[in-house]
Amino acid sequence: VRRPAFAFSAAVFFSAIPLLSARAIHAASPGKKPAQAQVLNSPAGLTEVGILDAAAYRIDVPANWNHSLVVFYHGYALRPASFHIAERLSGQQQPFFERHYAVIQSAYSQTGWALQQAYPETESLRRYFVKKYGQPRETFVAGGSMGGQLVAITLELNPKPYLGGLDLCGSVGPTYESFGHRFAMRAAFDYYFPDVMPPLVPVPADFEDTIADRDKVLTALRSNPSSAALMRNLTGLHTDLDLAHDIAYWTFVVADMQRRGGGNPFDNRNYIYTGTSSTSSASDLELNDKVKRYAAVPQARAYLMRHYTPNGHLGRPMLALHTIYDPIVQINQLALYDHEVQAAGAEENFVQQIVDREGHCNFTQNEMGDAFDEMVRWAHGGKRPTPGVLKQ
């Protein structure tokens, strides 16, 4: 039975340029000692927290450790993540720990679309773990939302330490594609609902994705049902509530990338808008004629392309799990990565599966655990999982 989308959480979400790839790998520093390290032993196992490379980290080793490791990447965070040593491991990491794997995770030294920081900082943490706790028998990589993109990055740039990876609701594929789509949709919203949201280029530096912002958008949508319907059709979102959330969230994401790139990295001048109506092309024509067009700043565009344009060369098996409807990481944005993997000749290392549920990362513990088990069997030389619906 399909369930409705649950409340959205704050944690959501390079062509791999060889120079940057090598720099990111070598930036990892296993020789550094962590700061503020604390260790707690309990009947469940050992937990260590601290600061490494300016990023908070957490290590969990179960009492009945199988001497294998899961390197975990969290998703897009609007606010800094932190770890509390006395808190029990939960969420997306729990199925791995329950299967007797050690789990390590970095909070990253920056919030937002922190691929530039997350990848080397997590690799540094992996090396620290190996140095302190010993070489694991096997190592897997997993992550949710933006963390799913980091799983793909890891298996493209540095597959050697890993046997396989699990991408949970991951925003995989070229950043310019998924974020450029969000930018274009925000521009379309401004045409239908002018002066509701702050300027798009540049987004004010102090903009925050708040409940008040979402309520403001929702009020505007409900005041003009015909334009709201055009926007829902255009974006593929099911409800005004989903659309209101995304308009505010997309604005924050655009601001994040403008800050990181040192200017606006998005360009909708050549974007052709389609899909506002299933019965007529007139509204598409009107939107394309009247929507405001923006040009990208070259240096900002270059940053967007570096972080990250995949090469598709998955060096290890990767299983991707998604809900059938995800208003944050939309399914129709994921096909391009599959095409890139096929073009790279790595299609045998990539499988996508879905569950019959709505919402972003809205999986049960059993579903995540079953998907992980499938991936491990596959990585051990077993049958390649069947694409489509996850079988339990």
Predicted regions and their residues:
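N-terminal cap/lid segment of alpha/beta-hydrolase-fold proteins
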Residues: 31-64
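Short beta-strand/loop motif that positions the catalytic acidic residue
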Residues: 320-322
